[in-house]
């Protein structure tokens, strides 16, 4: 019985430690801020931090629903081409190795003037 309890405790500890070490996926667009006014004549930069989690591999960057870049760095920046005047939606989505979004993303709205 003691061996059974010891085995159970060892298995439980191993399962817990694996669970504790697995980070949840997350995306943070650090800049620009939501609602920021960007220069429509400039190449603006977006900075980000990503934790891909156990199901993610890298991220894709979208402007107004169109994929514009595949980003392999988990912390970095992306310089956008000039944006036409008006509202724009910027999104970063975590994707798997097959480039399929896993449902973890952040989107912000900006205004180019």
Language-model segments: residues:
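Short acidic/polar inter-strand loop motif in beta-rich domains
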Residues: 96-103
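Short beta-strand segments within Ig-like beta-sandwich modules, predominantly Fibronectin type-III
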Residues: 67-74
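Short, compositionally biased P/S/T/A/G/V-rich stretches that sit at domain boundaries
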Residues: 22-39
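Surface-exposed, short loops/turns at beta-strand junctions within beta-sandwich domains
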Residues: 80-89
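N-terminal signal peptide c-region/cleavage motif recognized by signal peptidases
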Residues: 15-17
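Short coil/turn motif common to extracellular beta-sandwich-like domains
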Residues: 38-47
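Beta-strand signatures of extracellular beta-sandwich domains
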Residues: 58-62
